[in-house]
Amino acid sequence: NMNHRRKIKICINGRRVLLLSILCLFGFCLVAQVQPRRNATQPAKSKVYLLHADVLKKSKDNPDPNAQILVGDVEFRHDSIYMYCDSACFYEKTNSLEAFNNVRMLQGDTLALYGDYLFYDGNTQIAQVRNNVRMENRTTTLTTDSLNYDRVANLGYFFDGGTLMDEENVLTSDWGEYSPATKMSVFNYEVKLVNPQFTLTSDTLRYNTATKIASIVGPSDIDSEDSHIYSELGFY
């Protein structure tokens, strides 16, 4: 069906290996971590700067005596990314911070990341965003409750269920990643793609939000109003 092909093309074009790291604990909040794939070269370290806070104080209740407690219209900058929140703990010695409530990370006009909680490590350049998370990259939006964003790899990845939406399709899965630079996304476990013309279910799917091409790499079912197709390899 030509209308179907305009909406999405399904092909097999290469293999992808997905790696999940061992779960670990990090920071003052116990959150599950998934390490991204990185090149061997580590990022050059640069300083996280506090740009503004209505109130700055020390707190005896914080387990880190060097923590700066910030309240009201808090703003940080790290290289080209700006971070905003209602309150924060700034750990200047370790070049890291925790941000609470109304959290925003903005990088130019290409990337916006929102959530209720953020732990950001300026040395590794990894942001851990939790609860009501939304990543926006032009016409693509990724929503989840647990997302890590690796600034070096330019990769956002979720591991507790998520949804990616663009102009034509809605994709959901238990685990996934999205690259704002390449527009490529990878979905694993309980994958579902909903298009106005059909619904695709699979266990693994690759999807490019720029080209609207989906690559299936395993057993998949494609259902439309008048047909059902099962495919492991092939085109639709």
Model regions and ranges:
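Bacterial Sec-dependent N-terminal signal peptides
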Residues: N1-R37
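N-terminal amphipathic/hydrophobic interface segments
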Residues: Q33-Y236
